[in-house]
Amino acid sequence: MPPRKAHTTRRTPAKKSGVRRRLLRLLVTGVPVLALCGVAWLWLESVRLTRIEIVGARQADPGELRRLAAVDSGAALFDLDPALIADRVARHPWVQAASVTRWPTGTLRIAVEERVPVVLQMDAGGRPLRYLDAEGYGMPPGRGPVPDVPLLYGVRGPAHPMRPLEDEPVRALLTTLAALEDPARALISEIVRAPDGEFWLYTTPAAGQRSVPVRLGREDFERRLRRLVAFWQQAVLTQPHKTFSLIDLRFANQIVVREEAHPSTQKSAMGHE
């Protein structure tokens, strides 16, 4: 068998020239890019914090938010951790969420989303104590406009400023109130939790009516408040000549009311539609 001939591949001058051209192009384009990246990195390292911008704070004091952020003026801006700063700011009672953006101009932008108050909790002496949101978190009176929310009496806590109320019936009621439309929410002036745990509402005086006590009970708040709104629109606002002294929502198939037609008082029951 004849021996095999070894084949070798030789690069032609044209191929060698093409490789050189590609290497040259890489050098021409790559070196400036690397240099530019280096300059950009050095420039970012040189950017210093010159301003802290607070956005979205209406009730929370911007000065307190800056203090919670705990960043020094003149610090290297892009060495700061946005997530860490946002977590610090979110410890403010009014702040539900926070986000932090670093701008090359030297500005640190802190945007906050504040909690929405549902009621104003009153202390045992009838003085404003704190606002409560839908989740049961407490917020102290803020610096902005006074929120128009019902007053809440007879409730303790929350025990910790960073934790919500542990009272489940109260939290259920707060969630229900937060979901109400504005006209329905405006119907409620005060909420009282009696020593036996039962909730009473007092309506906002309107249409010739005094504030009417409403017996809400201990549960099923969403359905009962819907029935109250429907009854108020259909039976109270349409009959301004009638004076109601009590509305009882505890029964499944009817709303029990007490009317004051004359000096005498009579009881009546109205079926729920």
Swiss-Prot record:
A GO BP entry is: cell septum assembly
State the compartments where it is located: Cell inner membrane
The organism is Rhodothermus marinus (strain ATCC 43812 / DSM 4252 / R-10) (Rhodothermus obamensis)
> Where are the Cytoplasmic topological domains?
1-20
What protein am I looking at?
Cell division protein FtsQ
Q: How does it sit in the membrane?
A: Single-pass type II membrane protein
Keywords assigned by UniProt, alphabetized: Cell cycle, Cell division, Cell inner membrane, Cell membrane, Membrane, Transmembrane, Transmembrane helix
- Every copy of the POTRA domain together lies at 47-115
Kinase as a keyword of this entry, yes or no, is: no
Indicate the transmembrane segments per the record. Answer: 21-43
